[in-house]
A protein has these predicted regions:
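Active-site-adjacent structural elements in enzyme catalytic cores
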Residues: 1-139, 145
Length: 147
């Protein structure tokens, strides 16, 4: 079994996975698994009202997570995904409070890193819809740009 398939299986089993994106390493969980997502908040010491970004495999998944996709958002996704851009859109019923921090919106991103994309595609093959993630740095530590 390759590493990304093993990581996708771990996500489906409710475990946390570290994975690279083009900007940072992420700490991710199955975005539909409340207890797994809660472990991200616990591990990071992150307040529950701070939303997570849902990483998706392709633009086609936007409508799973967003109830409305304005034309400008679709155009931005076409132009800049995969890439380091997060779209903030009105959330659908799939985007639960435990991911969105009780916000009416959801942040969506298709990362431009071969490992992240392979992981997301393997996860989709297993029935996953998205990976809720944050940067792997601790909340109180400086970011790479601050160092």
């Amino acid at each position: 079994m390759n590493n990304t398939l093993a990581a996708a299986n771990a996500l489906k089993a409710g475990k946390l996975v570290a994975f690279p994106t083009e900007t940072v390493y992420g700490l991710g969980a199955d975005a539909q698994n409340e207890s797994a997502v809660a472990r991200i908040y616990e591990t990071k010491g992150r307040p529950a009202d701070h939303p997570l970004i849902v990483h998706i495999a392709s633009k086609a998944q936007i409508t799973d997570w967003a109830s409305k996709v304005p034309d400008y958002a679709s155009a931005l996704a076409t132009a800049y995904w995969p890439g380091p851009m997060t779209l903030i859109l009105e959330r659908s019923d799939l985007a639960k409070d435990f991911v969105t921090g009780n916000q009416a919106s959801v942040g969506l991103r298709v990362p431009n890193h071969p490992v992240a994309l392979e992981l997301l595609n393997e996860f989709v093959k297993l029935g996953g819809k998205g990976i809720a993630a944050v940067s792997y740095t601790h909340l109180t530590l400086p970011t790479n740009r601050e160092v």
